Amino acid sequence: MYTPSYLKYSIISIISVLFLQGTHGDDGGWQGGHATFYGGEDASGTMGGACGYGNLYGQGYGTNTAALSTALFNNGLTCGACYEMKCNDDPRWCLGSTITVTATNFCPPNPGLSNDNGGWCNPPLQHFDLAEPAFLQIAQYRAGIVPVSFRRVPCMKKGGIRFTINGHSYFNLVLISNVGGAGDVHAVSIKGSKTQSWQAMSRNWGQNWQSNSYMNDQSLSFQVTTSDGRTLVSNDVAPSNWQFGQTYQGGQF
């Protein structure tokens, strides 16, 4: 079959562009930012935080955690997301290794300081305040602050999603943690065994989700949707005799 010469050149051009995009593209999703550290050598100062996870050791997050600047935190919706990160462009301090951290806290802006002199977390900077043990995996302590390349990666978690039920009757505050896949939860619905339909929960703060319905004395199911649009249903996670302050484990992405 005859193919016009101009069409041949067009096809070759398209193939060349696709090849280059496949080779380089957006550099695998890598973006540029900076990292500092906090929390002490045992990361005890990172416990709690704006995502609501509490004891990061007990919740399974360990010390590979980060507080995100305003530009990344998204008012708490990014809590639970995972980032692959490496120190770069500073051979004096960079160790050449790569780590994966989970977003567990917020690094607040400091408008009284300039962006390049202490106001590291000021908008629009993309900044990670790492737990000290995490920082020391990619850079030397004396560096203080280093340039990094980072990208979102799937979260690899052991066990199922955890639902910690706090609050009281007519105020169910559910902390959702240990979420795999995208990691950051953007929508949650709850259903009791005595109710007819799913009820959307509202995000109270961090990854604490709220329902004002009376859910006592019935088993509870949860529907969790992450930022990538995937939804997972965990049926009858909490038995009918569930108690406030207890944690129940569901399925996993």
Curated annotation (Swiss-Prot):
- Which gene codes for it? EXPA8
Domain of life of the source: Eukaryota
Q: Tell me where in this chain the Expansin-like EG45 domain is found.
A: 48-160
Q: Which UniProt keywords apply?
A: Cell wall, Cell wall biogenesis/degradation, Disulfide bond, Membrane, Secreted, Signal
What this protein is reported to do is described as: Causes loosening and extension of plant cell walls by disrupting non-covalent bonding between cellulose microfibrils and matrix glucans. No enzymatic activity has been found.
Tell me which positions the record assigns to the signal sequence.
Answer: 1-25
The biological processes this protein is annotated with in GO are: plant-type cell wall loosening; response to herbicide; syncytium formation
Report how it sits in the membrane: Peripheral membrane protein
**Pfam families, per the entry:** DPBB_1, Expansin_C
According to the UniProt record, which cysteines are disulfide-bonded?
A: C51-C79, C82-C155, C87-C94
Q: Which organism is it from?
A: Arabidopsis thaliana
Question: What's this protein's name?
Answer: Expansin-A8
Q: Which Gene3D superfamilies match?
A: Expansin, cellulose-binding-like domain, RlpA-like domain
**GO CC list:** extracellular region; membrane
Write down the CDD domains for this protein, in alphabetical order. DPBB_EXPA_N (cd22274)
